[in-house]
């Protein structure tokens, strides 16, 4: 290529170099591990709980039912997405964090206990030997031996509590005897006896004293009268048949400020039969010496001998267990289970003997001779929700408080029990009413005004809503995965139960004796009975939940729409309710329930259903640009004029852009020509006119 051709060739376009140092510096600072800046309102989110997932599923199902949409995984996901997006996108109003809303809440099965009262129904007390102690049998107690005897300090309220022991307000223990006659014919031996001695409940008033109200039909229970003769049994001392009966008169077990407790079961003891006696006969009541002799410690005496010139008779025939009940100031049911706890506190002793007739000083002489070589240890147990508090229990009637320091929580009583302590029957609380505070108003679910606020935020911050929506979708995938895993686990647990049931059926083949099978069936029946009792409490709690309208963001307990009024229910009343007190200063639960149920009914019509979904649809329709145009002009002519104006403006912008681009090209060519001319050393000298023209025209 010659120099002339090089001169004719246009020089290359020079690029405009920018200063890239600041951009490079910024790129060097960018790292993927850098944390995002947290805004002042940002809060650390906790992982979703199972209760929140369950509540989210319930709300999504409810919305689909109200809108009559088929429940498919896709529709459930979209419904859950809508709910989560509404909650996430809701702007926090100014001053909302400082607001305080206090409502009544129902907490089912809190970690609290209360004393079992005389007005409660009898509880289930299980024994390990139903031959000598009647009642349901269960030889697997205690269920958790490692938890027996845990220390506890209690201070709870009461209203006629059930307590056993040597303390005011508790039923006192004593030894009681039950006698049966063995049919043996002998000229010397009048009667042959089998007797059982064990711990029972001590009468405070002699049962032979005639009280007018004792014979009143108002307090006499309905039942079979006790026999007039001593029950006759077989010679087998290993069998004792218990039969409930009602004695001719009642005994008073307690009559003080804690109430009047009576018992209509027979209280058998030996006494002198003075009928037909011409000489001076001792009192028909039990001899103090005899009573003292028979009620001494069951461990010291293994031989009893009663001698007299008068015949010995056994009063109050019948083999029946005590069934105490309260009759004043309130009336309650019978509680036969208390005796099963008392009799298990000491082993029972089995006696065998007879009554012989001799002649001394030409007079008949009667001797009762009893011997014992057999004792049987017993065990009585309760099952949840019931427990036994054992220790130095103090009942304070002035403050209606039961206190016990360093007490033990037990479920079983056996022969190692020390009667220097007392026994208080307690159970888990079914539920309590407490005021709770929230940082927002009570809502049954994300309501219409929340949807409206969200839609306003969508219209004003569209880009922010898109990013929020993406984040919500990603979060909801994790939530859905968690729920799916939980569903699989639940399904697996059901299969495990079936597997256990199959194994349980197969395990019955390993039982080799009918007694073992009977014991297993008895245990299963007892488990079923206790389960029914426990399920009854659960059903009562569910009944309350169904009748109440609860806040949408709670599932473990129920926050009701009833506002807490401190002037009407001060905190001291709530505290006494939590302690289990039932006096005039305690919270009136029945009245409070009526108010809360009425408030729940008033909010039933405010639950957002189809109206809420319609509001969402209307709000989303506002995102259509056509609706924005319609808001400016409502006629077609005006809309057409607006469109023409927009097109004219667009055309004007395009023409201006093209003109600016042509001017820029002309300037750039002129600059290139000047650059070429300035680089020539000799200018145009020696060049022909044609070359000059060619060079310039390039």
Swiss-Prot record:
Source organism of this protein record: Homo sapiens (Human)
Quaternary structure and partners: The surface (SU) and transmembrane (TM) proteins form a heterodimer. SU and TM are attached by noncovalent interactions or by a labile interchain disulfide bond.
Family classification: Belongs to the beta type-B retroviral envelope protein family. HERV class-II K(HML-2) env subfamily.
Residue positions with a glycan: 100, 128, 153, 273, 354, 371, 460, 506, 553, 565, 584
Extracellular-side positions: 90-631
PANTHER family named among the record's database cross-references: ENDOGENOUS RETROVIRUS GROUP K MEMBER 113 ENV POLYPROTEIN-RELATED
Name of the featured protein: Endogenous retrovirus group K member 9 Env polyprotein
Region (Disordered): 1-47
GO molecular function: structural molecule activity
GO cellular component terms, A-Z: plasma membrane
Signal peptide location: 1-89
Keywords tagged on the record: Cell membrane, Cleavage on pair of basic residues, Disulfide bond, ERV, Glycoprotein, Membrane, Signal, Transmembrane, Transmembrane helix, Transposable element, Viral envelope protein, Virion
Superkingdom, taxonomy of origin: Eukaryota
Region annotation (Fusion peptide) ranges: 465-485
UniProt cross-references to Pfam families, sorted A to Z: GP41 (PF00517), HERV-K_env_2 (PF13804), HERV-K_REC (PF15695)
Post-translational modification: Specific enzymatic cleavages in vivo yield the mature SU and TM proteins.
Cytoplasmic side: 653-698
Function: Retroviral envelope proteins mediate receptor recognition and membrane fusion during early infection. Endogenous envelope proteins may have kept, lost or modified their original function during evolution. This endogenous envelope protein has lost its original fusogenic properties. SU mediates receptor recognition.
Glycoprotein as UniProt keyword: yes
Annotated site location: Cleavage: 464-465
Compositionally biased spans, kind Basic residues: 10-20
Membrane-spanning residues: 632-652
InterPro entries given in the database record: GP41-like, HERV-K_env, Retroviral_env_glycoprotein
Other facts noted in the record for this chain: This envelope protein is encoded by a human specific provirus. ERVK-9 has a type 2 genome. The HERV-K(HML-2) family contains type 1 and type 2 genomes depending on the absence or presence of 292 nucleotides at the 5'-end of the env gene resulting in Env proteins of distinct sizes. Despite their overall retroviral envelope structure HERV-K(HML-2) type 1 envelope proteins lack a predictable signal sequence. Subgenomic RNA transcripts coding for full-length envelope proteins have been detected for both type of genomes.
């Amino acid at each position: 290529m010659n120099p002339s051709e090089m001169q004719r060739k246009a020089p290359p376009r020079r690029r405009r170099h920018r200063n890239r140092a600041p951009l490079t510096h910024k790129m060097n600072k960018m790292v993927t591990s850098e944390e995002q800046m947290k805004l002042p309102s940002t809060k650390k989110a906790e992982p979703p709980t199972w209760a929140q997932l369950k509540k989210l599923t319930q709300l999504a199902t409810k919305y689909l039912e109200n809108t009559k949409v088929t429940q498919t995984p896709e529709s459930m996901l979209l419904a859950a997405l809508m709910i989560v997006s509404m909650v996430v996108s809701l702007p926090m109003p100014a001053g909302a964090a400082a607001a305080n809303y206090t409502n009544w809440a129902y907490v089912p099965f809190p970690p609290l206990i209360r004393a079992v009262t005389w007005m409660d129904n009898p509880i289930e007390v299980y024994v390990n030997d139903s031959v000598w102690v009647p009642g349901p049998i269960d030889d697997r107690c205690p269920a958790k031996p490692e938890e027996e005897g845990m220390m506890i300090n209690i201070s709870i309220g009461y209203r006629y509590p059930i307590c056993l022991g040597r303390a005011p307000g508790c039923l006192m223990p004593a030894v009681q005897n039950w006698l049966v006659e063995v049919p043996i014919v002998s000229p010397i031996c009048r009667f042959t006896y089998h007797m059982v001695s064990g711990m029972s409940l001590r009468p405070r008033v002699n049962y032979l004293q005639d009280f007018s109200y004792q014979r009143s039909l108002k307090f006499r229970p309905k039942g079979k009268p006790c026999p007039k003769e001593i029950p006759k049994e077989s010679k087998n001392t290993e069998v004792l048949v218990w039969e409930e009966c009602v004695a001719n008169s009642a005994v008073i077990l307690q009559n003080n400020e804690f109430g009047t407790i009576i018992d209509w079961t027979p209280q058998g003891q030996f006494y002198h039969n003075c009928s037909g006696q011409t000489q001076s006969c001792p009192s028909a009541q039990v001899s103090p010496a005899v009573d003292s002799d028979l009620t001494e410690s069951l461990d010291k005496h293994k031989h009893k001998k009663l001698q007299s010139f008068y015949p010995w008779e056994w009063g109050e025939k019948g083999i029946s267990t005590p069934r105490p009940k309260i009759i004043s100031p309130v009336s309650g049911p019978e509680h036969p289970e208390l005796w099963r706890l008392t009799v298990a506190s000491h082993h029972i002793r089995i006696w065998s003997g007879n009554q012989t007739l001799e002649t001394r000083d030409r007079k008949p002489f009667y001797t009762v001779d009893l011997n014992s070589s057999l004792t049987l240890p017993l065990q009585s147990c309760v099952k949840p929700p019931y427990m036994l508090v054992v220790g130095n229990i103090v009942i304070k009637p002035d403050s209606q408080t039961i206190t016990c320091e360093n007490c033990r929580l037990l479920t079983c009583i056996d022969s190692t029990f020390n009667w220097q302590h007392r026994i208080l029957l307690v159970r888990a609380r079914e539920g309590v009413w407490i005021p709770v505070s929230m940082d927002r108003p009570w809502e049954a679910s994300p309501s219409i005004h929340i949807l409206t606020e969200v839609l306003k935020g969508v219209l004003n911050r569209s880009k922010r809503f898109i990013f929020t929506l993406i984040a919500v979708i990603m979060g909801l995938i994790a939530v859905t995965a968690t729920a799916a895993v939980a569903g699989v686990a639940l399904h697996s647990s059901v299969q495990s139960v079936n597997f256990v049931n199959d194994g349980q059926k197969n395990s019955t083949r390993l039982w080799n004796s009918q007694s073992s099978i009977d014991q297993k069936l008895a245990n299963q029946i007892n488990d079923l009975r206790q389960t029914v009792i426990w399920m009854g409490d659960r059903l009562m709690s569910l009944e309350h939940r169904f009748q109440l309208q609860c806040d949408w963001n709670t599932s473990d307990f129920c926050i009701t729409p009833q506002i807490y009024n401190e002037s009407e229910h001060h905190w001291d009343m709530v505290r006494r309710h939590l302690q289990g007190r039932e006096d005039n200063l305690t919270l009136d639960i029945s009245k409070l329930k009526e108010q809360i149920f009425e408030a729940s009914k008033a909010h039933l019509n405010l639950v957002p259903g189809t109206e809420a979904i319609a509001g969402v649809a209307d709000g989303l329709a506002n995102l259509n640009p056509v609706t924005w145009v319609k808001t400016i002009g409502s006629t077609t002519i005006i809309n057409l004029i607006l469109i023409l104006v927009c097109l004219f403006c667009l055309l004007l912008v395009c023409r201006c852009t093209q003109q600016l681009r042509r001017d820029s090209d002309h300037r750039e060519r002129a600059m290139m020509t000047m650059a070429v001319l300035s680089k020539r050393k000799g200018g145009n000298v020696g060049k022909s006119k044609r070359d000059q023209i060619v060079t310039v025209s390039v």
